[in-house]
Amino acid sequence: MKTIKYLSMLALSLVMATSCMNDFDEPTFEQPPFGNNEIGEANMTIAELKEKYASTISANGAKEVTEDCIVEGVVVANDETGNVYKQFIINDETGAIVVGVNDVGLYAMLPIGQRVRIDCKGLHVGGYGYMAQIGGLYDGSIGRMNKSVFPSHVRIIGAPDSTEQEMKPEVIDDSFFTNDNKAKLAKYVRLEGVEITEADGTALWAPEELKNSSNVVERHIKMGNTNIILRMSTYADFANEAIPTGELNINGVMTRFKDYWQLVISSTDDIEQISE
């Protein structure tokens, strides 16, 4: 009799446990698991943000954003191949900006073509050699935001989409390179029919023996009267691949450090060889 009573109580407990388990909601996966899904609509374009802090950016300073400020853009460069480090770049239809985060592997949450919103309130906006950046404060200048801060300031919108308007690079020529064109710094662009000066069929992108103190090897492109530096990291997946020869079409992010124009590519997929 005791055995029957025990088994009856056990069966009842299992039924109750199953019933309680069924009370939990099924996961929907409608919201991204990373970031802050409470961030609202964008209320400022990237161009407006850069204009608002223009004096701080041009002075290579940094200023905390104290008002409500949300920008939205599409990721056009990230750290997936190692040629970009602890930052990603977003473009909207008005401009582009660097977002610095003291973390690696950002591409896992922010692949190329991913639309994001950045809540700038509480972060800093500043300039480093003319380049506008959203990030944190570092020794009184603009630096990377702490990785623990970042998730509360970013919202992922939808799935990555390579057909986004911002993913269509702007084809540029020598007229692009003027001092008045700072609004387009960090813009995703396309250089057509250019050659890399060092390409001879055997030269590698970024061999260790040629690196500078930043673990970067500089390669060069001449477009009209403008010299463009290709910054190649020795940590890039393609660092020891041969530089393609002949005429090339190259997609990348156009940056500037003081008086030097620099092109950053995320991958060798950004390069199309049109003649050898």
What residue spans do the PLM features occupy?
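Bacterial N-terminal signal peptides that target proteins for export
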Residues: 1-8
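OB-fold nucleic-acid-binding modules
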Residues: 21-85, 89-276
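C-terminal motif of bacterial Sec signal peptides marking the signal peptidase cleavage site
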Residues: 16-19
